[in-house]
Amino acid sequence: MNNVIDFWPTLKRLLYYGTNVKKYLILGFTLLLFSSIFEVLNPILISCFIKHYFINNTVNYSLKIITYYLILQILAAILNYHQNIIFNKISLTVIQKLRYDVMSSTLQLPIKMFDQRPIGQFISRITNDTETIKELYDTVIKSLFQNIILILITLITMFILEWRMACIASIIFPIALIIMLLYQYFSKPILRKIKVYIANIYNIFNEIINGIDVIQQFHQEQKFRKSIKKISISHYYFRMKILKLDSFLLRPLLNFCSTLILCGLILIFGIYPIGFFEIGTLYAFITYLNRLNEPLITITSQQSIFQQAIVAGERIFEIIHTPKQQYGDDSLHFREGNIKVKNLYFSYTNNNVYVLKNINIFIPSKQFIAFVGRTGSGKSTLSKLLIGHYPATLGKICLDERNIQTFTHNVLKKNISIVQQDPIILNDTILENITLGRNISTKKVLKILKTIKLIQFVNSLPKGLKTLLGENGNILSIGQKQLLSIARTLISCPKILILDEATSNVDLDTENNIKKILSSVKHLTTIIAITHRLSTIKHADNIFVFNNGEIVESGTHYNLIRKKSYYKNMYYSQAIKN
């Protein structure tokens, strides 16, 4: 029974989006009302035509009735055309607002959401689910209102014409209600599973497109074909279940019930003496029963679309209602850029399995600091905490003697920048990839390109800064992408600069270039380099060595090399390999 009841909160939220287009809704429903009235009047006119032409033989009056009938048909067609335009406009406006809201909420979600969920799930909800809700507005709501009006007017007319026959015809309503409730109960869990499989299909295609080089290199095509086939078969299975449910509970069952009621009407007509019911009245009732049957069939058959929209709404509102990334309200910018981490513990889950344990460090401003350690030792995790993506489980992080959790998003964004191992390059110009829409002069951009030694390459391009870089910067080498990523961070003059494995994928020349860049900006910003390449951080002011989520030692390169240390073993082991 819960499946029948729990759609109301979601439906109310979906209908609330229509309040922004109240005027259009009122106009659309008004046009629907009049077009429905005109449609209901047509059988009465035909009934009168039969009476006056075939029985009373009054030709002139019959011609008038035909004229009225044609006028009503034309008016109904005009009104239907305009209300279709209006409801399509309403649905597009509502979906535009809904997509904006879900996209806006997605942009503010905690980073852990993207770490824990496949990207395909988000794409499915933003595209496929919102398109499903569009059908709720341009098909279901319009049709529901129109058919309810048709049913009410038809019923009133039937009771005015002949109440006995009307009572028999009304039996169809409780039957239709039972069918709708049964359909709703059985269809909702199936539709939820269909949505999950659609999201999985989006996700696997996203993986294939983004990782096509690796898939082909390691001959994994067959594995992904099997994955697609498995998900597609599951999707097909549940689609067929819903189609079978539609085929049994919707149109066929209602048609059968309607036929039984029609037999009942004919039986009543036959039981009463000849002349008790006019032949025109019987014709009108047969017509009205069909008119009743069609709206009820439409309403029940649209239960599938309605249920899909409710399930899609639940998935969308789950994103919208997810607590956003939490920031404080301290809008005072950094003065220096020093960092203090005290008694810090961190776990990605709530099971007390800490990936960082008892971290205590102090980093003075404008120093070059390095975090080193083997893969999985906790270096990059600490960087995520330093930029505010995750809160500490225990302990605290202070920037400029203030708790990081008190800062606004804007302050953190302007004062802390990070260069990732795999730079994200937009399908835009070089200029836009550096400025990212910020109000930065071309002169300043050229200056930073000169600093990172990309100016010669940019000047060699026919369009210079206006050159389009293509999908993920496909006209650039890996080293050039990384230098461009460094340029976009340095141009905003951050107080703290974090380089997370920024040199791991570049050649030796680019690595040396990056070292020179860091040396030139060292007096302007606090630099934290997270790296496996120990040769790049030999001149760091302090090196923190991580192992199993703990800092096991710290000091300069030369101090750590002089004594028997974990760092020394790492350094010489790497030197021998090189």
From Swiss-Prot:
GO cellular component term, pick one: plasma membrane
EC number(s) on file: 7.6.2.2
GO molecular function: ABC-type oligopeptide transporter activity; ABC-type xenobiotic transporter activity; ATP binding; ATP hydrolysis activity
Keyword Transmembrane: yes
Localization: Cell membrane
Superkingdom, natural source: Bacteria
Binding-site residues, ATP: 373-380
SMART domains on file: AAA
Primary localization class, coarse: membrane
Catalytically driven reaction(s): ATP + H2O + xenobioticSide 1 = ADP + phosphate + xenobioticSide 2
Record membrane topology: Multi-pass membrane protein
TM ranges: 26-46, 59-79, 143-163, 166-186, 196-216, 260-280
Record InterPro entries: AAA+_ATPase, ABC1_TM_dom, ABC1_TM_sf, ABC_transporter-like_ATP-bd, P-loop_NTPase, Type_1_exporter
Domain called ABC transporter: residue spans: 339-573
Pfam families xref list: ABC_membrane (PF00664), ABC_tran (PF00005)
Protein keywords: ATP-binding, Cell membrane, Membrane, Nucleotide-binding, Translocase, Transmembrane, Transmembrane helix, Transport
Domain (ABC transmembrane type-1) ranges: 25-308
Family indicated by similarity: Belongs to the ABC transporter superfamily. Drug exporter-2 (TC 3.A.1.117) family.
Protein name: Multidrug resistance-like ATP-binding protein MdlB
Source organism of the structure: Buchnera aphidicola subsp. Baizongia pistaciae (strain Bp)
